[in-house]
Amino acid sequence: MALIRLDKLRHSYVPKPAADADWALKNIDLEWSDGGAYALLGPSGCGKTTLLNLISGLLRPTWGRVRFGDRDVTALDPGDRNIAQVFQFPVVYDTMSVYDNLAFPLRNRGLPEAQVKPRVEEIAAMLELSPTLHSRAAGLSADGKQKISLGRGLVRSDVAAILFDEPL
């Protein structure tokens, strides 16, 4: 986990925001400490998902800075931020086995199978997915698929934070 700071963060989906109503997020100054667990609460449409997408890099803020510790990551691509995001609806490769779904982020980063296998088995055990490791993900329940989404974030040792956007 990393210290996450949001400095005067503002975001608009309007190309040239002029009115107050043009802003999805207005002047957010927040700091989340290393190792903490935090929740964003609010009604639908208030900007929770937008804020998470700004932190993960899926969106770039219209104004302000996103910092991890003292490092400004505002302009970094999502892959360079070492953030895992678990979305409301599970993102799972149905044609792959549970094992291959969990191994995907590690293989994508070029880790040798000798390092992939023990890490996948460790995370599968933690999430109680071991009995299904060699089954196709398509056969799992919604909560089993969400465990895979979570597992793909946990399997990487370089992840600084895991962001949950209304997980089941």
Regions found by a protein language model. Give the residues of each.
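Conserved ABC ATPase signature
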Residues: 75, 136-146
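The feature captures the beta-strand-to-loop junction immediately N-terminal to the Walker
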Residues: 41-43
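ABC ATPase C-loop
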Residues: 133, 154-155
